[in-house]
Regions:
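Short, hydrophobic alpha-helix immediately C-terminal to the catalytic nucleophile
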Residues: 99, 141, 165-169
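Alpha/beta-hydrolase fold catalytic core
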Residues: 2-84, 107-110, 150
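Tryptophan-centric aromatic hotspots in well-structured domains and transmembrane helices
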Residues: 60-61, 74, 94-95, 131, ...
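Active-site loop/oxyanion-hole signature of alpha/beta-hydrolase fold enzymes
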Residues: 69-70, 114-156
Length: 189
């Protein structure tokens, strides 16, 4: 009986320590790029992909950061030219998730924009307390407005559904079509 109580107390203490470690707020980790990428709307900080990531995409991709707020950089992959198609991954993936979709599209007629949410992939890592839906919506909207998108088709899944649709709701008139998969979101009140 005493052994059972001791083991139970030890397990409870370990659980408390594990929870404290998991929920603590960490420091912001800001990625660094190298060089510049030129787009029609301006120059951005280039990010050369590591070999393992570069090996799974075709030529023609641009990899860069958009600083949406001081110290908050979002990594963006894009490929193609033409009508903007904004795709938003879920958790815990990255914009690289949509590379196989992009490979099937007519890249001479569409521009596939694949941002990676803050906290994931090569984007800035933030404290747990900063991961709110409102923050992610605002940051992704800043990506879209920085790229000066006046219209786009959107596809998103998982957590990318509410983040992407929320980001687009902050720029009325941009959304021209949507494919929302394996997600949920609520309408504004």
């Amino acid at each position: 009986m005493r052994t059972t109580i001791k083991v139970g107390a030890l397990l409870a203490a370990l659980l408390v320590v594990a929870v404290l470690v998991l929920v603590q707020d960490g420091e912001r980790i800001i990625p660094e790029g190298e060089g510049r990428v030129e787009l029609d709307v301006g120059e951005f900080e280039a990010f050369p992909l590591p070999d393992y990531a570069a090996a799974v995409i075709s030529d023609g991709y641009k990899s860069y950061f958009i600083e949406v707020e001081p110290g908050i950089k979002i990594h963006v992959l894009e490929v193609g030219q033409g009508y903007p198609v904004y795709v938003q991954h879920g958790n815990p993936t990255t914009g690289l998730l949509y590379r196989k979709v992009a490979a099937l599209l007519p890249l001479d007629r569409v521009r596939v924009i694949m941002p990676t949410m803050v906290g994931l992939g090569y984007s800035t890592k933030i404290a747990a307390s900063e991961h709110t839906l409102d923050n992610h919506m605002r940051w992704m909207n800043r990506v879209l407005t920085t790229l000066e998108l006046t219209e786009a088709v959107y596809a998103g899944q998982d957590w990318g559904g509410p983040v992407g649709m929320g980001a687009l709701s902050l720029s009325p008139g941009v959304l021209k079509g949507a494919v929302v998969m394996n997600t949920g979101f609520r309408a504004p009140r």
